[in-house]
């Protein structure tokens, strides 16, 4: 090779080594940058000049080294696995958070547990049974009933407020998903423009990958990179970002004021989720924070009527996309708690008013009255509860939101005197009241067309067979929530370990190691020095030839 050509070989070594040094320094400077991916230099030979042809091969001379590519070091399999498990972890974190919040509401309200109000009511019933005709025991009983209803209303309000909090978080989550999708779309355009030539838009790609990681925690996604370098995103099996088309999620309020998440007008407001699907890791249907928020929240304020039918409780209404009560943490708690209150107040009312004469069939004698309906109609007949219109119309139902203490009894607690027509004390009714409270015996169900008596003990939901009295009923509700919460906590711990393991595996591939980059700097610096010395030697040879000649 001519000496002048050899200078170009040395120059290419200088340039390539300098670029490699810059890349290693760039890696080191971003070692703490969130989402940064290690960049790696690929070097190769420049093209060869053919200077002759020998009998066995071409006679070629190389012209140096070439800076082939600056690539990101990533593992697509680890990325996909991390994003799926990250979404699953977010799903169960919401479940765990919801159960903890409900445990707090059920177990503790303003420093006093709801169970304490149950115990006080039980004590007042026992004292009433000892001396039913006493104005003192009757007054204490009514006062305790009033305190009990206040505490029950406070717990119910807490559940409803938390449900509304989840509802507002749904809108925020949808906005976040749309914002992230728009940002990814913008980065797609920047990457495609930057990579039209031979450039590598690695920093843009880092930002995009970081956003995709964030998006994966909010909604189940799958990504595909097209030939132009843009990323296509499918959310819940439907296109979210394809080419120049970005599909925004939209929230639409249902008749109960809760937000449904849809694909917007472009897809006729079709729902994003099928809530009648089984939520399971086997089907990959337990992924994404948004989905978990919707399931935990439910689609309406539940009450005891939602627990009357096994199929509706577990599977929802056929040919609709409503959320089954059993699948919703908040609605399940609302329904079970309201069932406890409903069964208690109707049993107390029915025991006290069961044998009432016509003069008392005005509702004045029942302890718990309905806000939207009297106990009896003008003919003196009991106004039955109509649950078919729930939750839109609960005016005839003995549900927490439609209850108050009989104002006449608050003024004069002795209206129910527990005195028979023969002027004797009605110990039988007081004893019956105590037995019913303890879950013993039967109580009349006035909603039936004929005189029907049902057990004074109830199951907490249609999936369980064991029956409980009121205090045991409440303990079962709290215990069930604690068990569910424990399961979710275990899943969250397991998922966090899985996500952490996958992230560690990813970092071993894409993460920046300061020791490795320092070794690269030393290596490329030595290569730079070698190229420099090579040029110096060629320079000295040229100088010697020129001066000698």
Task: Label each PLM-derived region with a short phrase.
Residues 1-549:
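Structural signature of extracellular appendage/secretion-system components
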